[in-house]
């Protein structure tokens, strides 16, 4: 597998407080990685550094052998797509127009190409958004908006997907379908890195799990190694029972 990201002592300090301790990590293509940990653990900060959205970070964060901060924005956008926790659209764009915005890094003129339209059609089919393609984005439910934004970044045809809680607002059916889609994208060669609070989704679909606590990466391994009662208690402060599915994946139970 080809290495895409190389982080060496990458961290972040705000107003004298170290919100992400220096971390040394490598990320390769064809991988689905989950970032888990309590609120304020540094997950979104790490993702933001990788997305080129945290200027002034400590250490090094290189993508494709070049420091993220030195990439031209348009060229970087063709390589790396980022999905934030929420997106605001103030103007009356349809869902399809929002998805077409994902093609912006490729547009050289005023009109979209046949390739642009094909990429949008495919992305909307994958995310089950075709049925409301003509609706005003602002009128969509939270889950519909989230799927539309995901379609937009898939239309971008990147090598890397960085997602900050991609299943926020989604019902159970679409949570599972989106994670299956992300896993399939990883199997097709993409690097997918997703922040999640759902440990069972992380366990079921991720190749690798990074655990963050108080700004520090404390575990980095396969879900089977990471998601155990001891780690869950130490990081999240809750007692849990971990069973295993027929496929050997951890399944976490809470409560008595």
Residue map of PLM features:
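The feature captures the beta-strand-to-loop junction immediately N-terminal to the Walker
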Residues: 36-38
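Conserved ABC transporter NBD signature motif
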Residues: 59-67, 76
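Conserved ABC ATPase "signature" region
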Residues: 100, 114-132
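Conserved ABC ATPase signature
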Residues: 136-140
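Catalytic Walker B motif of ABC-type/P-loop ATPase nucleotide-binding domains
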Residues: 161-165
């Amino acid at each position: 597998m080809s290495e895409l990201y190389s982080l060496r002592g990458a961290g972040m300090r705000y107003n004298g407080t170290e919100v992400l301790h220096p971390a040394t990590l490598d990320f390769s293509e064809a991988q689905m990685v989950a970032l888990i940990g309590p609120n304020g653990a540094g997950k979104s900060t790490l993702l933001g550094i990788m997305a080129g959205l945290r200027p002034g970070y400590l250490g090094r964060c290189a993508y494709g052998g070049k420091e993220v901060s030195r990439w031209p924005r348009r060229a970087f956008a063709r390589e790396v797509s980022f999905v934030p926790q929420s997106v605001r659209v103030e103007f009356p764009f349809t869902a399809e127009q929002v998805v077409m915005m994902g093609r912006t890094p490729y547009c050289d003129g005023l009109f979209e190409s046949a390739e642009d339209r094909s990429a949008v059609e495919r992305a909307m089919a994958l995310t089950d958004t075709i049925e409301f393609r003509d609706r005003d984005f602002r009128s969509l439910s939270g889950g519909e908006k989230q799927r539309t934004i995901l379609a937009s970044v898939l239309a971008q045809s990147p090598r890397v997907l960085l997602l900050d809680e991609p299943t926020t607002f989604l019902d159970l059916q679409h949570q599972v379908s989106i994670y299956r889609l992300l896993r399939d994208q990883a199997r097709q060669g993409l690097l997918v890195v997703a922040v999640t609070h759902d440990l069972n989704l992380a366990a079921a679909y991720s190749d690798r799990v990074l655990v963050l606590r108080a700004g520090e990466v404390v575990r980095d391994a396969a879900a089977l190694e990471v998601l155990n009662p001891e780690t869950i208690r130490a990081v999240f402060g809750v007692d849990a029972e971990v069973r295993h599915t027929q496929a050997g994946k951890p399944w976490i139970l809470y409560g008595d």
